[in-house]
Amino acid sequence: MALPPQYSERSVFTGLITDIGELIGHEGGRFAIRSRYAAASIPPGASIACDGCCLSAVTVRADGAGSAFTVDVSNETLSKTTLGSWQVGRDVNLERALRAGDELGGHIVSGHVDGVARILDMRPDGESLRVLLELPLHLAPYVAPKGSVALDGTSLTVNEVAGTRFGVNLIPVTLTQTTWGRKKP
């Protein structure tokens, strides 16, 4: 199926979360998510990053002041992400695909997830929250101090790296406008 001309087959994102959606259902590989995005703004085939994973809207309907949309998730995606463990009611970081002329305030994020990091520790650090994570060994060479990472779709700067462990800081706005404020080690 060809996508509408305003969408390319290679969508990119910024890692700046624009909504926190809610998983309202899933059956097999089809997931349904409620969002504040207007239904009319999401044509079938539109790319939406769901916790950083680029997924294509299959069906879209109005839902209150926002929308509910479905996405199909492949076995490959389930093997590289946390989507297989999602339960109804779960909050999901959402971001629409970047369009020409949009502000690029985070960093270029492909939405192609390479693996899952594990939260080891979270502790206050001034006005921010310091998070220590561990990633799979095969990804360690790609994480560098002061480099960018996307975690649950959120663009973050790496503070330090030690082997497979790395740290980031979450500022207050990130904690309130993403799902990061609800996470625990």
Predicted regions and their residues:
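Conserved loop->alpha-helix
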Residues: 2-185
